[in-house]
């Protein structure tokens, strides 16, 4: 009983093994390379020649696959090593460029741009100061010009009044001394009378002067004074004697002296104003020059800083462009290396597949030649033409 079971088991094992061999043959036959090998083997079987030479050829082919794979492995290892070196160099370059980019950006944002803002503010401040001092200087000069014009007008008014009073005094003095205006044949103590013509002349002089001085901008009181003198002149014929007229002359002298004193005070005040103006103007000019010098220095510093900023920005642009270029080169190189890896893997798989086919075929020829012959014959009977 045990013998029967063992025999059945052996039969089942043989049947299973033969089935596996047939599956292997069919699998090999499905590949173009395997079909070519089987076609070659079938031709050899048809000639009846020993298959030793074919087995030797297949063995050499298998060995060549192994050698080629080793050579390919070495080339791939060398190529991937070069890829690693290149990628590492790109990464190092990118790291250095990014570090430089960060430094440049930090210098711009943390140092140069704030400095520029400060200098721009300083320039604006100094421009405002220069403008303010220049305005003060212009206003000071304008005020001085206005004061001088006012002074000249006052001097002219004083001079006009002096001329008017001096002329009136002359008329009084000349006519009181001229015998043609004094009635003769009377004692010296008798009153001296002015003629009507003299009175009219003096009255006209003061009336005209009153109208003229009414246009004065500063000493408008002269007009009233000269109107009063005109009234006095209209009554000059009624003056009792030359002593009364002399009082008028003395009054004129007193007025002339007061006008002279007033003019002296006016000139003194003008001198003080000029002195004060010169001092004030000197202070403003000094402040203007200091502010102008500070402005020039600030503008120069700003221009120099802008040059530095332009250089740093240009360096930053160059660095950013380098990062883009190196990144693109790294991507291209990485892609090449990955494609090479894929090509190597595909070639290795294809070579391994062909090697497996050769190895399996050698095994079939050496161990399962009968089954292989039967399957090739069946394939031939099925219509497969070699």
Swiss-Prot record:
Entry GO terms, CC: trichocyst
Keyword terms, alphabetized: Coiled coil, Signal
Signal peptide range in chain numbering: 1-19
Parts forming coiled coils: 51-154, 294-325
Domain of life: Eukaryota
Compartments reported by the entry: Trichocyst
Propeptide segment residues: 20-48, 184-238
Similarity section: Belongs to the TMP family.
Function description: Structural protein that crystallize inside the trichocyst matrix.
Name of the protein in its database record: Trichocyst matrix protein T2-B
Underlying gene: T2B
